[in-house]
């Protein structure tokens, strides 16, 4: 399968490496037209305000709002998928969640921890960098993981969102789950 990574900012190469380790083809998506070539899309981390500005500039907002592609958002990608963002309007409105930006603190408060992610594994390494958390989930959203009582991973149908950066580790099981359990079944 061909899985795209929105290549406007963030750890694009690292996500593509995880896609390839999962046995699939990774494509850096830089143009809206490329969405026709893929079966699923990863929205990488970075700075969420910048990501939204770039998505507006290159026409991705409307295209992705209207898209039926399965999507996986990490960190800022999670924020972009959310229906609501504390103090702001949602953006793509794909996940029925409310997200709090930077809720784990500033850059100096970044941390790594082992995660037990329902349906994936009990020993996933999570890298949290200025990470958001999911403050509230709506109907149809499955909570997959919490850290210190804060929700950090959810799934709603063909949409997966995590607060952390799985692509910054050698463990590709979260990406593999997205492709082989979400994209394949969509």
Swiss-Prot record:
Please name the InterPro entries in this protein's record: Class_I_gatase-like, PdxT/SNO, PdxT/SNO_CS
Q: Family per UniProt?
A: Belongs to the glutaminase PdxT/SNO family.
Question: Pfam families, from UniProt?
Answer: SNO
Q: Which residues form the active site?
A: 75, 165, 167
Q: Which residues form a coiled coil?
A: none
Which keywords label this protein? Answer: Glutamine amidotransferase, Hydrolase, Lyase, Pyridoxal phosphate
Q: What is its EC number?
A: 4.3.3.6, 3.5.1.2
Species this chain originates from: Staphylococcus aureus (strain Mu3 / ATCC 700698)
Matching entries from SUPFAM superfamilies are given as: Class I glutamine amidotransferase-like
Metabolic or biological pathway: Cofactor biosynthesis; pyridoxal 5'-phosphate biosynthesis
Task: Give the protein's function.
Answer: Catalyzes the hydrolysis of glutamine to glutamate and ammonia as part of the biosynthesis of pyridoxal 5'-phosphate. The resulting ammonia molecule is channeled to the active site of PdxS.
- What is this protein called in UniProt? Pyridoxal 5'-phosphate synthase subunit PdxT
Gene3D superfamilies for the chain: 3.40.50.880
PANTHER family, per database record: PYRIDOXAL 5'-PHOSPHATE SYNTHASE SUBUNIT SNO (PTHR31559), PYRIDOXAL 5'-PHOSPHATE SYNTHASE SUBUNIT SNO1-RELATED (PTHR31559:SF0)
Task: Show the catalytic activity.
Answer: aldehydo-D-ribose 5-phosphate + D-glyceraldehyde 3-phosphate + L-glutamine = pyridoxal 5'-phosphate + L-glutamate + phosphate + 3 H2O + H(+); L-glutamine + H2O = L-glutamate + NH4(+)
Asked if Hydrolase is a keyword of the record, the answer is yes
- Cellular component GO terms, alphabetically? cytosol; glutaminase complex
Q: Name one GO molecular function term.
A: pyridoxal 5'-phosphate synthase (glutamine hydrolysing) activity
Key word Lyase present: yes
How does the record describe its quaternary structure? In the presence of PdxS, forms a dodecamer of heterodimers. Only shows activity in the heterodimer.
Which residues are recorded as binding L-glutamine?
Answer: 46-48, 101, 129-130
GO biological process: what's one of them?
glutamine catabolic process
């Amino acid at each position: 399968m061909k899985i795209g990574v929105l290549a406007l900012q963030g750890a694009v190469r690292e996500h593509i490496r995880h896609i390839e380790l999962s046995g699939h083809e990774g494509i850096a998506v830089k143009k809206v037209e490329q969405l026709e070539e893929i079966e699923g899309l990863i929205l990488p981390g970075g700075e969420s305000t910048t990501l939204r500005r770039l998505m507006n500039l290159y026409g991705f907002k409307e295209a992705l709002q209207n898209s039926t592609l399965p999507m996986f958002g990490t960190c800022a990608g999670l924020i972009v998928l959310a229906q609501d963002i504390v103090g702001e309007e949602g953006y793509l409105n794909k996940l029925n969640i409310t997200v709090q930006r930077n809720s784990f603190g500033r850059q100096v408060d970044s941390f790594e921890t082992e995660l037990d992610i329902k349906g994936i594994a009990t020993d996933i390494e999570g890298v949290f960098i200025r990470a958001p958390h999911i403050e509230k989930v709506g109907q149809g959203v499955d909570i997959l993981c919490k850290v210190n009582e804060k929700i950090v991973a959810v799934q709603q149908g063909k949409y997966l969102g995590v607060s952390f950066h799985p692509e910054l580790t050698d463990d590709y099981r979260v990406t593999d789950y997205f492709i082989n359990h979400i994209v394949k079944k969509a």
